[in-house]
């Protein structure tokens, strides 16, 4: 955009300075104005205003050199600037034209002059051109050959909502006291031609469209919004696509024209395709300088509508598929939560089983190392359990049976119980033990594992006191019995007291 603005400003300054050198005739200006008014009226009646506007513009701007343009509006400048002090020095336009023509048809170079007629130096790139809004003496413009692809009508559409100075980024405020100020020209047509493009950028006024002059290389601004499919066939620069493509859908944007000059011979090249195979592209061609947008065809509108319907249906299908996937994921997650709970319960059960196994193994270890004392000798013959083994797997303690374990010690069968009673043992006999080493049989009148026989002794009284405390008698009766127990003396009295306690407590 900066390059285009600098280009138009430099061209306008050239035209103004050239008009001072060769003032035009007022008759020619009046003739051109009459022709344009007549053509405008006829085109308004026939409904072909757009086509006639282009013809009018071409009639006005049919010359491309600054010297020929000066023949059409110089009298207006001369009349408007009478009585005004001329503060600017003349510029030799002929020298600049000779320098421009020496660069060749492919590359055209413009130079920037201030209002004093001096060339501005140090500006090499048009993109870095800054046009200040200060005094006219500090202003400089640099014009390079820029692409006419971006039209003034496009810029008016983009910046019509705000003011021109703030939206365009550059201020072209000229001092109205200077003779070269374009905005102070009093003639209506010249103001519409130059002042409108400077301030509004090509807005339509009174049914007329402002058209800027074509490039000195040739008329390339009247091309339609269609790409060049083939090369030029000659060593000329291919201008490519003359529209700025706006994409609403699709992927590929048209490539702009390269503004740099080529060092070698130029090769033929085609434009970038407007569409790709994987995505449909809707391209909106913006109006360029000297061009009109082509009307959309009905079949294209219908195809766009069908494409939108298909796209909407596909989006709906994708949305339903995503919803189904979400529901499936939710059900799967709920089942996973249940599985996690079951896994925790299974782990707790496994821990309990392992604890039970440890307890069982501990009990088994204790049972293998302990022998329970079940007497097998000393019972009365009238006892029904005398000859019955309660638990044959549990062995009695060694010593309850006389002569038990002698076979393991002497490696011979032990003596029977009858032989022990009838015949005596020979001391020192082979295979027999001394009598003193043998255990005595259980005394029926003394306390043993087969029964409690109370005696007037402290252990017997302690056993009876324990029986009283564990009984279900009232606490007051327990205290009375314990006090009586302390005063009892003698085996018979203690045995009688024991029998009474057994009857009371149902032992």
Swiss-Prot record:
Maturation and modification: Phosphorylation on serines by host CK2 is necessary for the formation of viral factories.
Function of the molecule: Essential cofactor of the RNA polymerase L that plays a central role in the transcription and replication by forming the polymerase complex with RNA polymerase L and recruiting L to the genomic N-RNA template for RNA synthesis. Also plays a central role in the encapsidation of nascent RNA chains by forming the encapsidation complex with the nucleocapsid protein N (N-P complex). Acts as a chaperone for newly synthesized free N protein, so-called N0, allowing encapsidation of nascent RNA chains during replication.
Name of this chain's protein: Phosphoprotein
Region (Disordered): 30-106, 128-163, 248-306
Keywords, alphabetical: Coiled coil, Phosphoprotein, Viral RNA replication
Organism whose genome encodes this protein: Phocine distemper virus
Pfam family membership, one: Paramyxo_P_V_N
Coiled-coil regions listed: 309-343
GO MF assignments: RNA binding; RNA-directed RNA polymerase activity
